[in-house]
Design a protein with these regions (language model features):
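Conserved NB-ARC/NACHT P-loop NTPase core of NLR-like innate immune receptors
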Residues: 1-201
Length: 201
């Protein structure tokens, strides 16, 4: 996980501990096949978000029972519907979704690559226009990713090997914490050479 995402997550977790708020986060990793696909992202977010209250847990329990007590895998559409239901049910709380390192999701050839599915997922949830939903996406500035995210983004932070990087991270964290209007969505781009250890930008 990148240092900028770690900073944002820790700040938001502090808010979640002192008040009613929900956080879900996922990071892609080209070294781990379990962290390279949209199908791993959505169940992870569902589990995180549904663990905070009774109504959310009821949705998770229904998902389990509707698929023969876990014997059958739910379809992509069913998982997406379940996540949307959780987000809609949580309209009284701020919700923060952090998706880290989208560039490490494979962009393979085919009808729809794993990366394209993730980008479509982000677009679909931004289009929900939930006033309490805040989405932060981090990635290297690759063209296909920018083409999708740039039109959706209200706040961007570019991290390069230049002075002021620490301030950018702090600004992005504050932005995620304080913006409370519209379906806010932030994008953080990493510049320069990708480090092997994503904790050390």
């Amino acid at each position: 996980m990148s240092s900028v995402s770690s900073t944002i997550i820790q700040d938001i977790k502090t808010i979640c501990e002192t008040g009613r708020a929900l956080i879900g986060y996922f990071y892609f990793d080209f070294r781990d096949v379990n962290k390279q696909h949209w199908r791993h992202l959505v169940p992870f977010l569902i589990t995180q978000l549904s663990s905070r209250s009774g109504p959310h847990f009821d949705i998770l329990s229904r998902l389990y029972s509707d698929h023969d007590s876990g014997a059958r895998q739910p379809s992509d559409n069913f998982l997406t519907k379940c996540l949307k239901e959780i987000l809609t049910l949580s309209d009284q709380w701020p919700i923060y979704l952090i998706i880290d390192a989208v560039d490490e999701c494979p962009n393979t050839s085919g009808i729809l690559s794993p990366r394209e599915m993730v980008l479509q997922f982000v677009k679909d949830f931004v289009d929900l226009r939930l006033p309490n939903l805040h989405i932060c996406v981090t990635s290297r500035p690759e063209i296909d990713i920018r083409n999708v995210l740039d039109p959706l983004t209200t706040y961007q932070v570019s991290l390069h090997h230049q002075s002021g990087q620490k301030k950018d991270i702090e600004d992005c964290s504050v932005c995620c914490l304080l913006k409370g209007f519209g379906a806010d969505h932030e994008k953080v781009e990493e510049g320069g050479q990708r480090p092997r250890n994503r904790d050390a930008l």
